[in-house]
Design a protein with these regions (language model features):
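N-terminal lobe/hinge region of extracytoplasmic solute-binding protein
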Residues: 37-87, 116, 184
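Surface-exposed binding/hinge segments that line
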Residues: 84, 89, 127-172, 193-195
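Structural transition elements
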Residues: 314-355, 375-381
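Ligand-site clamp/hinge motif
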Residues: 208-257, 385, 397
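Aromatic- and charge-enriched surface segment that lines or borders ligand/interaction sites
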Residues: 81-124, 145-148, 284-286
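Gly/Pro-rich hinge or "lid" segments in bacterial periplasmic/extracellular proteins
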Residues: 162-219, 223, 339, 344
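Detector for C-terminal structural segments
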Residues: 28-29, 195-198, 298-329, 378-388, ...
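Ligand/substrate-recognition segments at binding pockets and active sites
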Residues: 352-427
Length: 524
């Protein structure tokens, strides 16, 4: 089975988030209630169907993964206490003390069932083929206390895949229908009340002792409430007033929250903003000379400030922090800003100015249909207008097309009625991008921009044959090859503000480090 493009793109754009959290001011106090704002309802709570970041934030309270990741990008134990890795498989030895929220032990068979349910074509899981690689199988040995994940051929990040699997245990293994509105996991908290559109309440499991190394649930809050607050201004007001303990802010309310007394904060990278050129044979951007000229026409530093409303950072790669492969794949690999050189390059490519200033070649105008999501905020809208002006200055005719997410996915997957698209991406492993940046083109495949970069594919093929650490140089070079060919243009690393009042907590890749949640002294 191949993941449908629309679902896969949703996963790329919405699933991942970076590391973040807030430091404590003063001591901490056990018990009490920690209240955190979610910007939307998490929807169906079955881990196999969780594609939204808010869903996975919610699930992270109640479920564990096989392994975790620390702030430096290193894999650390979770349900698995140790592992052995081969090019095409990894065998995990599970802890013996982990139990499910209903008291049942967590077994290798539970892990295997979680994986094989995701990979079952009948499940139609949107994370299969993106977070869980196509072809993965799981086999349990309950007597030995091990579970083996295998692939039909070598796969670099087979160990790292273990951090993407929320393990269902206990009653949820036998009856997955209960997972739509309840939880059945081994996490530090269990769901006790779900009021869709309003709040989700979790109670601590004091017996929890199998979290990240060196952590404890002893002083954790008795209750965690995730409150649905769609409006950021409202969420900011609630935090400042003390009605909330934690929020994540994307927009202009960040400034006043940062300045509010008693608020601790962390700036966290959560996604990359970039645009892609459609390389179909009938498109002007099929020609690499045109793509590079259009890129040269843009002051990317200025565009980054516009798109992020001044809160972004320079991009250094496609994978979110903490990265399994450390390095800057962007600097020195993107065509530099030079409008005069851009105009000259278009002249050389045969695109000559017409009577109205729009360039023409073989009777065809240099028209670019620019597609972007209207749900990404005012900065992305302003960025679209900036690009239209910059490209208009060198003789391109730009038609802006703002669309909601579902329409954008339809355009990418089916109608292909675009020439340039602004598409945020958030992935935790470089392998999660391969199907979207190479291979069969849409609508038959997931390669929505019709990319055909032989250097990228060759480097990916080499990197995929060896474990992640050995292949990192090749993975990094593969990203740079995309930028050098102007297949896609990285613009900005988008950030959010993680803010807390009366509490402290940590998040990694959009998921709670549950044993880090604490109420500070004096909190209610």
């Amino acid at each position: 089975m191949r993941t449908p493009l629309a679902a896969g793109l949703a996963a790329l754009a919405l699933l991942a988030a970076g590391c973040g959290g807030t430091g404590a001011e003063g001591g901490t106090a056990g018990g009490g209630t920690f209240t955190y704002a979610l910007p939307a309802d998490p929807g169906v709570l079955d881990p196999a169907m969780g594609v939204l970041n808010v869903t996975n934030t919610t699930l992270s309270l109640a479920y564990d993964t096989l392994v975790g990741i620390d702030a430096q990008g290193e894999i650390v134990p979770a349900l698995a206490e140790r592992w052995t890795v081969e090019p095409d498989k990894v065998t995990f030895t599970l802890r013996k003390d982990a139990t499910c929220s209903d008291g049942a032990p967590v077994t290798p068979s539970d892990v295997a069932a979680s994986v094989n349910h995701i990979t079952d074509p009948d499940t139609k899981s949107p994370i299969y083929g993106v977070l869980i690689p196509t072809g993965m199988k799981a086999e349990a040995d309950d007597a030995a206390g091990t579970v083996t994940l295998s692939m039909p051929k070598p796969f670099s990040f087979i160990l790292e895949t273990g951090r993407a699997i929320f393990v269902v245990c206990g009653k949820g293994v036998e009856d997955r229908s209960i997972l739509a509105r309840s939880t059945s996991g081994s996490g530090a908290y269990r769901l006790t009340e779900a009021v869709p559109g309003d709040h989700y309440t979790f109670k601590v499991r004091r017996e929890y002792a199998w979290g990240a190394p060196g952590t404890s649930i002893k002083d954790a809050p008795e209750t965690v409430v995730l409150k649905i607050v769609p409006n950021e201004q409202t969420a900011a007001n609630l935090l400042v007033s003390g009605a909330l303990n934690g929020i994540t802010l994307y927009g202009p309310d960040r400034t006043r929250v940062e300045a509010a007394p008693g608020v601790t904060k962390t700036i966290t990278p959560v996604a990359n903003g970039q645009f892609f050129y459609h390389q179909g044979e009938d498109r002007p951007t099929h020609d690499p000379a045109v793509r590079k000229a259009l890129t040269q026409a843009v002051d990317l530093k200025e565009l980054a400030g516009i798109a992020s409303s001044g809160t972004g950072k320079p991009p250094t790669g496609l994978v979110l922090h903490p990265r399994p492969c450390q390095g800057d794949t962007v600097t020195g690999h993107v065509p530099a800003h030079d409008p005069a050189a851009a105009a000259a390059a278009l002249d050389a490519a045969g695109w000559k100015p017409g009577p109205d200033g729009v360039r023409v070649k073989d009777g065809k105008r240099l028209t670019l249909r620019y597609l972007y999501a209207t749900t990404r905020g005012a900065g992305v809208q302003a960025a679209a207008e900036y690009l239209a002006t910059a490209w208009g200055a060198i003789g391109a005719e730009v038609k802006l097309n703002g669309a909601i997410d579902t329409k954008l996915s339809e355009s990418l997957n089916t109608t292909q009625d675009w020439d340039v698209v602004w598409l945020p991406i958030g992935v935790t492993l470089p392998s999660q991008l391969v199907g979207f940046l190479s291979g069969p083109a849409a609508p038959k495949g997931a390669n929505f921009a019709h990319l055909s970069n032989k250097q990228y594919q060759s480097l990916v093929d080499e990197a995929s044959q060896v474990p992640a650490a050995e292949g990192c140089d090749k993975w990094l070079q593969a990203e740079s090859a995309l930028f050098e060919a102007a297949d896609m243009v990285p613009v900005v690393e988008t950030t959010v503000l993680e803010a807390a009042k009366g509490a402290t907590y940590e998040m990694v890749a959009g998921m709670f480090v549950t044993t880090s949640i604490r109420l500070t002294q004096g909190a209610e």
